[in-house]
Amino acid sequence: MLVPLAKLSCPAYQCFHALKIKKNYLPLCATRWSSTSTVPRITTHYTIYPRDKDKRWEGVNMERFAEGADVVIVGAGPAGLSAAVRLKQLAAAHEKDIRVCLVEKAAQIGAHTLSGACLDPGAFKELFPDWKEKGAPLNTPVTEDRFGILTEKYRIPVPILPGLPMNNHGNYIVRLGHLVSWMGEQAEALGVEVYPGYAAAEVLFHDDGSVKGIATNDVGIQKDGAPKATFERGLELHAKVTIFAEGCHGHLAKQLYKKFDLRANCEPQTYGIGLKELWVIDEKNWKPGRVDHTVGWPLDRHTYGGSFLYHLNEGEPLVALGLVVGLDYQNPYLSPFREFQRWKHHPSIRPTLEGGKRIAYGARALNEGGFQSIPKLTFPGGLLIGCSPGFMNVPKIKGTHTAMKSGILAAESIFNQLTSENLQSKTMGLHVTEYEDNLKNSWVWKELYSVRNIRPSCHGVLGVYGGMIYTGIFYWILRGMEPWTLKHKGSDFERLKPAKDCTPIEYPKPDGQISFDLLSSVALSGTNHEHDQPAHLTLRDDSIPVNRNLSIYDGPEQRFCPAGVYEFVPVEQGDGFRLQINAQNCVHCKTCDIKDPSQNINWVVPEGGGGPAYNGM
């Protein structure tokens, strides 16, 4: 059940918006209106308030059942499933018995998967050379490839020359959730133990500091943090090697970065938020196999982003469309969701949708840092693959093929080490250094290196258009071999400017036909969580959202969240506001954890199975 967004009925708040008080006065007003003698408790999660200090937990049995495996994989996306499949393929070919366990927080494989998606099939075909015979859902080869620059009223076509990264010749338009579901079936047929609905909540360590495995999350905890009568401790899964394939900005990967200092020699990751819808359209507007990409309006030149519109051949006139907004944007008044809704009204987009019906909505963060932001990938007992470390080719607008290849290479490296007659390890958890070496010698590394300067080239005075000029000159001539590497501008959360330095953005109201409100959109994601559990959007300090984020940045979390999770509502007594977290609405996009200017929000897993229920997104 979704939580409806509260109506901000506070007279002071309404007065501010009605009179459009000058932006220079906002921090002063916000601080005064937010003044309150006590800060209401928001966070009740045990990661913030440890249970060993809570009397309500005295006498509760906290023992966990443990299982052992050779390899444990966290996350059933393209990378995790590729690793699982390749491991079992190798085990069968060499008649080896290797136990592979894969845990996935979604209730069904593919239910948390969201992507455009236009697939470069190279790695997929390598993994499944007989994919046609097995009925893989690659139904829509690209037949037409278009790119354009949008102004408010016009579309300026740009030719896609052979060799440029955005060329889609030979690619397929896919519903990635369906493809992942099919891969899950292949993995199980090979003997992989797949456990959907089990969220990996904790990294376990040996006494020597190497990774021992993971623990799934506890269930049966009340919203206030007390144990229910149905409380059950999570399961421990121990392994010789644990593969972390959580996807973009994984919460366990965050811990591993700190534990093993994996980002010591790379730049901070930079991200985008991708918002997507599926529509059934009028058949006369349907062009199966057409791929459309644009940059420009509704975003300004200093806000990185772009759109996609893909015509699928799935037995009905179906299109997938979306907008990606770089999370290094500076204006706290920007709402990626409302920019997406506005984009659909462009004269080159709206005619495709008129007379159609929207059937699905979702959102997910994606990595945009590229080559410069790749961390160290291996550590004692584990390794990172896929979108967790970030192998997306940004100008190509693709990361599934590189994620799959990283999973394949990880599996081959692990298999070699597990089956080596001279297996030796300085730590209890195996350190598979061969994986990183093999990746650096693969086409993945070469591909990402060749486009390393395109995303940071958009930070110049010309913004996105400067990046296009750079691509046209240097990539076209030098193919990424220029003797320099551009840098990013720091972490995304650092880029946000105070509200007083920015202009509020006036968004048009949704018309209910082409554009829609937030709550009706989230309803189409199938999102659901157990209501009586602690919010998994935790705050390190409950006072910061009002005292800092609202005061200085006008509460950007109420805009950057694409699911209406965060609201500033009037306090029940006295003047001021408090932050309300509608955790049930969360679509697990991770944007809040990334963009919060105070880095106060920490996303952790809810009870397993909760979250969106995407169907082929």
From Swiss-Prot:
It is an enzyme of class 1 (oxidoreductase). The modification Phosphoserine is found at residue 551. It catalyses: a ubiquinone + reduced [electron-transfer flavoprotein] = a ubiquinol + oxidized [electron-transfer flavoprotein] + H(+). PROSITE patterns: 4FE4S_FER_2. A ubiquinone binds at residues 305-306. FAD binds at residues 71-85. Signal peptide: none annotated. Its cofactor is [4Fe-4S] cluster; FAD. The keyword Transferase does not apply. The keyword Zinc does not apply. [4Fe-4S] cluster binds at residues 561, 586, 589, 592. InterPro entries: 4Fe4S_Fe-S-bd, ETF-QO, ETF-QO/FixC_UQ-bd, ETF-QO/FixX_C, FAD/NAD-bd_sf. Accepts electrons from ETF and reduces ubiquinone. Monomer. Belongs to the ETF-QO/FixC family. This is Electron transfer flavoprotein-ubiquinone oxidoreductase, mitochondrial.
